[in-house]
From Swiss-Prot:
Name of the protein in question: L-seryl-tRNA(Sec) selenium transferase
EC number from the UniProt entry: 2.9.1.1
Pathway info: Aminoacyl-tRNA biosynthesis; selenocysteinyl-tRNA(Sec) biosynthesis; selenocysteinyl-tRNA(Sec) from L-seryl-tRNA(Sec) (bacterial route): step 1/1
Cofactor(s) named in the record: pyridoxal 5'-phosphate
HAMAP family in the record: SelA
Organism of origin: Pseudomonas aeruginosa (strain UCBPP-PA14)
Subcellular location: Cytoplasm
Amino acid sequence: MSSVRLPSVDRLLRSAAAAPLHQRYGREALLATLRDLLDELREPARHGALAEIELSEAVLAGRAGERLAAQHASRVRRVFNLTGTVLHTNLGRALLPDEAIEAITLAARYPLNLEFDLASGKRGDRDDLIAGLIRELTGAEAVTVVNNNAAAVLLALNSLGARKEGIISRGELIEIGGAFRIPDIMARAGVRLHEVGTTNRTHARDYEAAIGPRSGLLMRVHTSNYSVQGFTASVPTAQLAAIAHGHGLPLLEDLGSGTLVDLTRWGLPKEPTVQEALADGADIVTFSGDKLLGGPQAGLILGNRELIGRIKKNPLKRALRVDKLTLAALEAVLGLYRDPDRLAERLTTLRLLSRPAAEIRAQAERLAPALGEALGEGWEVAVVDALGMIGSGAQPVARLASAALCLRPRQPRRLRGRALRNLEEALRGLPLPVIGRLDDDALWLDLRQLDDEPAFLAQLPRLRSELS
């Protein structure tokens, strides 16, 4: 095959085929992409490895368009979370209700009274946007909000216990994720760790014996992401508060996930509520906004008015504060808690957590035939009972009864690993990536969080073509 001549960049830029790309991506991006493309084709064209049709304006514009689309595609993508873990940290945790999404849109589009008191016409406090709701729902005297619960714990410790000792049970020196360890956070906050008791048993006398002139606070951490069972003992919040107050010290309680309602009402495991911690005497309570609360990422610090005032004056508060979008979403979510009778209908996270297993199984029965057809004869598709998790460190032992589509390759065991990896990759490569979990030589798709059946079904033909 003889060599062919490449069209010039200028000719391609002025071609009708490239006009839509110019309009969508701009001249500079299109020019750079065309230059790169022609540079790659120059050597093959010189050696006759390309046909004339491959260098037509339409074909080259099409290839440039594919590259530009890939370059400009958003890195933030919607996915189907079919892992069985509802509050999946890697997949975004809590899904916001419609009310919060509308509030975010409003706050993003228009000016708003973020730090402006409409009554007085003077500068306001952004925490006031949710302070009234928090007081109403929890009975807390005051509140401040930062960007996550790790920040809440850090700020509270630094404000109340810097250069002093923080007394905490050895069994509560938890690690969450790969970088949040209570001893490390205390050190960063300038608080000297004074651990008492043992891993499995801590008594009131341990705290009493530890208190001295260097003591700054007592701390209690809810061990939400693991469970110690058997021969155990711990000091209840009310008793710990009495010990702290008897020595003029504050009690800081970190609830981690945190909830404002008794989850057993919806058949979920018991989790300590913010109201209970405050009623039992905790002076400061911290918890997350994007876990069991079902809101945006945030760290809420509630409690004693004087102590919250000290926390708000800490220079770190400005570095850790939340923006208008977070506050708008948080206010909307908190507002839903005013009507607990309809909370499971309106709060997306609670609705998904409390979804009946029978309803999920019926959905699996509907979807199994279509998925089986897309996968072909090389796969067995079975509807099975499944056990999901709340996630994000909440109730690690508890399981949520669910149903899943279990996808198992009809191949010898030694070949199943590759087949499963190929299927996982194909599912992740769909327009709406599907994320499941591997277990027992099969890929499980837990349907607890599958809200959009039509979108899931619409891309099954694409899956079949990817696997063929």
